[in-house]
UniProtKB/Swiss-Prot annotation:
Belongs to the RpoE family. NCBIfam families: RNAP_delt_lowGC. Participates in both the initiation and recycling phases of transcription. In the presence of the delta subunit, RNAP displays an increased specificity of transcription, a decreased affinity for nucleic acids, and an increased efficiency of RNA synthesis because of enhanced recycling. The keyword Thylakoid does not apply. Disulfide bonds: none annotated. RNAP is composed of a core of 2 alpha, a beta and a beta' subunits. The core is associated with a delta subunit and one of several sigma factors. This is Probable DNA-directed RNA polymerase subunit delta. GO terms for biological process: DNA-templated transcription; regulation of DNA-templated transcription. Keywords: DNA-directed RNA polymerase, Nucleotidyltransferase, Transcription, Transferase.
Length: 144
């Protein structure tokens, strides 16, 4: 059966609008309805489902709510959608009481790693640039 993937996604959106409306639904539920609508055979299902799932994930009309539930974005209030998108993409840092110092520890660890990479072990005053320049000079001396 020759089915266009865009047709599957657009039909999935129509099915969600008419059958599920503002109610959450599972991927399995929407897939079963798409299979029924297009009369997709059991033989063709494995060939279509992976691409459909990928397109489904990429389509901004479908929003993952967690616990295997999805919802159409058109039926969501802005605050509900905004809360989910912020949780998914961590648009702002969230601190809980007693954990404020974790960000400072992270910065200290990053500085230690940078010092290690640049060759600064804290025992001397050489900068990374000075160390690199010294290595270049040593290499030149060895090859002359």
């Amino acid at each position: 059966m020759q089915v266009e993937y865009l047709d599957l996604i657009s039909q999935a959106k129509e099915i969600a609008e008419t059958q599920f409306k503002a109610e959450p639904f599972s991927f399995d539920a929407i897939w079963k309805e798409v299979v029924k609508h297009f009369k997709i055979s059991k033989q063709d299902e494995p060939n279509l489902i992976s691409r459909f799932y990928q397109d489904f994930l990429e389509d901004p009309n479908f929003v993952y709510l967690g616990e295997r539930n999805w919802k159409l974005r058109d039926f969501m209030k802005f605050d509900e959608w905004n809360k989910i998108s912020q949780a998914m993409f961590v648009t702002k840092e969230i601190f809980e009481e007693g954990y404020e110092d974790l960000s400072n520890k992270k910065k200290e660890n990053e500085e230690e790693v940078n010092d290690f990479i640049m060759g600064n072990d804290g025992d001397d005053n050489s900068t990374g640039d000075e160390i690199v320049q010294g290595l270049i000079n040593d290499f030149r001396d060895d090859n002359q």
